[in-house]
Amino acid sequence: MAGQVVQYGRHRKRRNYARISEVLELPNLIEIQTKSYDWFLKEGLLEMFRDISPIEDFTGNLSLEFVDYRLGEPKYDLEESKNRDATYAAPLRVKVRLIIKETGEVKEQEVFMGDFPLMTDTGTFVINGAERVIVSQLVRSPSVYFNEKIDKNGRENYDATIIPNRGAWLEYETDAKDVVYVRIDRTRKLPLTVLLRALGFSNDQEIIDLLGDSEYLRNTLEKDGTENTEQALLEIYERLRPGEPPTVENAKSLLYSRFFDPKRYDLASVGRYKANKKLHLKHRLFNQRLAEPIVNSETGEIVAEEGTVLDRRKLDEIMEVLETNANSEVFELEGTVIDEPVEIQSIKVYVPNDEEGRTTTVIGNALPDSEVKCITPADIIASMSYFFNLLNGIGYTDDIDHLGNRRLRSVGELLQNQFRIGLSRMERVVRERMSIQDTDSITPQQLINIRPVIASIKEFFGSSQLSQFMDQANPLAELTHKRRLSALGPGGLTRERAQMEVRDVHYSHYGRMCPIETPEGPNIGLINSLSSYARVNEFGFIETPYRKVDLDTNSITDQIDYLTADEEDSYVVAQANSRLDENGRFLDDEVVCRFRGNNTVMAKEKMDYMDVSPKQVVSAATACIPFLENDDSNRALMGANMQRQAVPLMNTEAPFVGTGMEHVAARDSGAAITAKYRGRVEHVESKEILVRRLVEENGTEHEGELDRYPLAKFKRSNTGTCYNQRPIVSVGDVVEYNEILADGPSMELGEMALGRNVVVGFMTWDGYNYEDAVIMSERLVKDDVYTSIHIEEYESEARDTKLGPEEITRDIPNVSENALKNLDDRGIVYVGAEVKDGDILVGKVTPKGVTELTAEERLLHAIFGEKAREVRDTSLRVPHGAGGIVLDVKVFNREEGDDTLSPGVNQLVRVYIVQKRKIHVGDKMCGRHGNKGVISKIVPEEDMPYLPDGRPIDIMLNPLGVPSRMNIGQVLELHLGMAAKNLGIHVASPVFDGANDDDVWSTIEEAGMARDGKTVLYDGRTGEPFDNRISVGVMYMLKLAHMVDDKLHARSTGPYSLVTQQPLGGKAQFGGQRFGEMEVWALEAYGAAYTLQEILTYKSDDTVGRVKTYEAIVKGENISRPSVPESFRVLMKELQSLGLDVKVMDEQDNEIEMADVDDEDATERKVDLQQKDVPETQKETTD
C-alpha cells in the first residue's frame, strides 16, 4: 500500500501520499490580523499618545499630557451588536494631566475619547452590524533607494531617493554634463554641494576632503554659485519659498522643519532600520580593496591593513569593530541648522577595475540609535557618499519590486495612522482653546474635543478602501480575505498606474506571497495572498521559515529560522524535496537550490538553509488543490479563486481526494467553533455546547470553570447564504485546546467541504457539453446533492415626515383582503408564511400632501372634526424574482428604548426570507483545477450512461476541455477518487509532494479497477455500449455563487429615465434590454421597418404612444400610430441650447410646431401629459 494513514482532527483519517515529513506545524492562519491588533492595543495606542504629548499653548504656560488609557466593557456583546446594527466597540478612557506652569498646579482627569471598535476572536470587526475585514496593505518601505537609469544618449545614470514614512523626500540625480543635483521635496533642483554647505561644510576643500576627489564632485562645485554656509542656506530658502524675502534664520528654521523636526519628519523604526542597513559600511565594503587601514578608534589597533580585500570571512572577523567605531570622525559644525556634532565613519578604498589606481571614500552613517526617527546630517552625508560610490562602481542599486523593499501595513498600523490624523486635528483645537479659556477654572475635559478622533476612526472603518465587507461565501473565502495583501488603497498604487513589473511574480515572493492566487482582471498581481507558512515581523516585512544547515557537519538541524527577503539573498537554500539520510545529511553531492533569483545545482557543502515544506510557496487556498503540480498555472489560479465562490450546500461532504489542508483551513477560518481550553464536554445541544475546563496543577488534573459556546443557527451570512453550525462532539469527550467542537457552513467532521464527490465521465453526449457545458443527472436534483439554502433580508422603516409620521399598519388603502392574508394585526408578515414576488411583507402608509377640500368634505370636517385620512401605500413588497418562506421577523421600536435607530426613524422591521435552491440549468459548476462550466441539460437518471454494474454516472464533461487547458490534475483526481470510493477511504495528496503515477496506479489496482482507469459505458437510452472505453471516476465538483435565479430577469413596463424617457437598464433597476445601434443595423438590413419603428417608439421613449398602446392591448383594440419620440425633442433642445434655430418642416415646407403635435396627440388620446414632470431621477410609470 502506498502512503500512510494520518489522523486529521478527531473524526477523519486519510491515506497520505506525502514523502517529506512535516517538520513545522502550520501557524495559526489568521495570526496576521489578531497579532497586529493586539500590538495596537498594547503598544501602538500608547506610542501615539506619547508622540503627541505634551500639547503646550503658545506662551508655554499650559501643558497637556496623555498619561495612560484603558478600554471599558463593550456596550453590546458580539451577537447583540449584529442584531441591533450596532458597532462592536469598547469605550476608550484616557487619563489626561494638565499642568499650569505659573502656579505649578496639576489637574488630572479621565476623559472619554469615543468608542473604539474591537476585533473579534476570528479577526473581523463588526461595524454597524456587518462583519468587516481590514486588508493588509503592501507599500514601499521608507528607506534610501538607489536607481539605475539609461538616458536618451544610452549613458548609464543613477538617481537616489530618501523616502520617509512621512515628511519631505530628498532626491539626488545626475545630468548629461555629469553634475550631481539634489531636489528637496520635489521642488526645482540645486547642485548637491549647496545642501552640503548648508549642513556646515562651507568651503570647497572641506567638501573634497569629506567625499573624496572625483570628476563628478568637481563639476558640481563649478556649477555651485554659493561659497559658504549662509549663502547656501539663502539659496535653498529661495528655491523652496520663491518670492519671500530670505533671511538666514528663516532658512535655518525652514530646513530644520523639513528634515530634523520629529513632528514633521518621521522615518519610523522601519525606516531607521533600512537606512542603517543600507548606509552602514559592512555591506558596502564587501569585496573592496582598502586604500587605508581600518583602525579601532578606541584602542588605536589596526584590524585590517591597507590593500586587504574584504571578503565575507574577513568582514565577519572585523564586523564588531566596524559596527562600533572603526575610522570614525566627528565634525563640530558651526552656523548651521543643527548644533550637535556629526559623527561619521569614513574609509578610503580603491576604485574597482581602475588602471590609474584612483581611490574613493566610503562614508557610513555611524549607525544612529534605533530611537532616532528623524534623518540626521550623517545620513545625508552617507547617502551622498553612496551616490558618488555608485558612480565609481561600488554598491548596489535597489529593485523596488523586491519584497525586501516592500512592507505590510497590517490592521494595527493602519489604525495607528488613522488615529494619528484624528489626534493631530484634536491638537489644533486644544491649542486654540488654551489661549481662549480662563486659566483658573480650566480642566482637561474642557480643552479636549473628541469629535475629530471619533470621526477619523469612523471614516476608516466605514469608508476606507482597505476596510472591506467580509467575503463570507464559505470558510475558505473568509480565511483568504483575512490573509489578503493589497497594493491598492491610500498611500499605495492605483490600478491605472501600476506597471507590469509591480504585478509580476518576483523571486523574493517565494514562501512569502502566493504566485498563483490573485484575481483575474484589472487587479491581477496587485492583490495577493500570504503564503501558508509566512509571518510578518515587527517592521512589517514578510518572513518565511527555513531549516538551518549545520555548516560543520553539513546536516540539517532542528533549528528553524525565519528570514526576510533581503536576508535570504545572502544564503543558498536547498529545496524541500532534497534527499536526506536518517541523520539529516544530503544524500546527493549536487543539490538543486536557489540563490537570489537563480535556480541552480550546487555542491551540498554550499547549502545554508533548506525549505521547510513543499507547500510553503503557495497560499492556503492554493494548497487545497490536489495534484496542483500537474496543472497549468493559469488554470490553477482559476481553481484557487473559484473555490472561494463555492456556495455552502445543504448536505456537505468532504472530498475523497484532499490535500490535508482541509482540516487546518476549516479550523482557522473562524467559521467553526473551537475549544478555547482543554476540557470535558458536559452538555451538547444544537444551540450550545458546554465544556468543563480541565486544569493541571502539580501534576494532577482537576475540573475548572464551565465554558459556554453558543452556536449560530440559520443566520444570514454577508453573501446571503445560510450560516449554520452543527456540533460534532459528544458528551463525555475530552477536547484539546483549539479542537473543533462544531462544524460551520461548508464543513463536514472538522474538514472543509465546499462541494460533493460525484461520478464523472469524460464523454460527449449529443453535443450538449459543447464549450465546457456540463450535463447532469436528475439524481443530483432529486436527492438534493447540490441544494443550497439562501436567506435574504428586507427592511422597512417608519419615519417622521413633514406631513406626519409614517405608520406600520394592516389598514392599507386600495388593497384586497387576499393581499393581506399573510399579515398579522400589526401589518407585519408572520413567520412561516410562503411569499412570492409582489406580496406585502410590511404594510406601511405615508401621509399625502393636503389637498383642497370639497364642500361636502368641509361639512363632514365641521361636524366630525376629522377629514378622511389622506395616505398613500408605501408597503414593503417582495421584489421581482424573489420569494420563499419567512424565516424570522425582527421589530425595533423607538418607544421601547431602541437607541440604535437612526434619527427620524420610529420603527424598523426586518424580514428574513429563506429559499431552498435546487440545482438548475444555467447554474455554474466547477472542479478544483479551474475546470468550470454551465449546466446545459439535466438528463433523467434512466437516460444517463451507466457502468457495467448498472449504476448511472452523475455528470458528463467534455473531454476537449482538458488537453488545451493543460490541467491534467483533474484526470489524476478522477482516477484516484474512484479508487478511494471503491476502497472506502479518504486520501490526501499534498501539493508538490502528493501521489505520483505509481501511487495512483497501484491504488487503482488495489481497488480492483482496470489498469487504464477506463471502463465500458452503456447508453441509457438504447442500452448499447459506447464505441470506446471512457474515463470514469469520482471528481469533487462545486456549485458556484453565479446562480441562474439571481440573473434571470424580465420586464413588461417599468421605470423610465427622467430626461430621455427611455427605460432604465439592469436587473437592479428593473430595467429593459438595450436595443443598441448594431441591433438597429441588423433590423435595417432585414428591412423590418415596422418592427424597428415600434422598438424606437412604443417600446422606448414615445411617452404618449406607449400609454396608448398599453390601453389598446388591455381593451383589445388596434394599436394607433406612434408619435414623436422624446429623444428627438431632447436633441432639438440640445441644438437650441447651442444657439441653433431648429425647425421641423412637413413635405410642403410648412413648419410643424412640436407643442401642437403634443397637444393634438394628447387630446386625441386622452393622455395626461402633466405626469411627465415628476422631480425624481427615476420615475415609475403609472401604467
Swiss-Prot record:
Alphabetical list of InterPro entries matching this protein: DNA-dir_RNA_pol_bsu_external_1 (IPR019462), DNA-dir_RNA_pol_su2 (IPR015712), DNA-dir_RNAP_su2_dom (IPR007120), DNA-dir_RNAP_su2_hyb_sf (IPR037033), RNA_pol_bsu_bac (IPR010243), RNA_pol_bsu_CS (IPR007121), RNA_pol_bsu_protrusion (IPR007644), RNA_pol_Rpb2_2 (IPR007642)
Gene3D superfamilies, per database record: 2.40.50.100, 2.40.50.150, 3.90.1100.10, DNA-directed RNA polymerase, subunit 2, domain 6, RNA polymerase alpha subunit dimerisation domain, RNA polymerase Rpb2, domain 2
Positions with biased composition (Basic and acidic residues): 1163-1183
Annotated stretches, region: Disordered: 1149-1183
Enzyme Commission code(s) on record: 2.7.7.6
UniProt biased composition (Acidic residues): 1149-1162
Pfam families: RNA_pol_Rpb2_1, RNA_pol_Rpb2_2, RNA_pol_Rpb2_3, RNA_pol_Rpb2_45, RNA_pol_Rpb2_6, RNA_pol_Rpb2_7
Catalytic activity, as annotated: RNA(n) + a ribonucleoside 5'-triphosphate = RNA(n+1) + diphosphate
Lineage top rank: taxon: Bacteria
UniProt keyword annotations, A-Z: DNA-directed RNA polymerase, Nucleotidyltransferase, Transcription, Transferase
Gene Ontology MF terms in the entry: DNA binding; DNA-directed RNA polymerase activity; ribonucleoside binding
A GO-annotated cellular component: DNA-directed RNA polymerase complex
GO biological process entries: DNA-templated transcription
PANTHER family, A to Z: DNA-DIRECTED RNA POLYMERASE I SUBUNIT 2
HAMAP family: RNApol_bact_RpoB
Family according to the record: Belongs to the RNA polymerase beta chain family.
Subunit structure: The RNAP catalytic core consists of 2 alpha, 1 beta, 1 beta' and 1 omega subunit. When a sigma factor is associated with the core the holoenzyme is formed, which can initiate transcription.
Cited function: DNA-dependent RNA polymerase catalyzes the transcription of DNA into RNA using the four ribonucleoside triphosphates as substrates.
Protein known as: DNA-directed RNA polymerase subunit beta
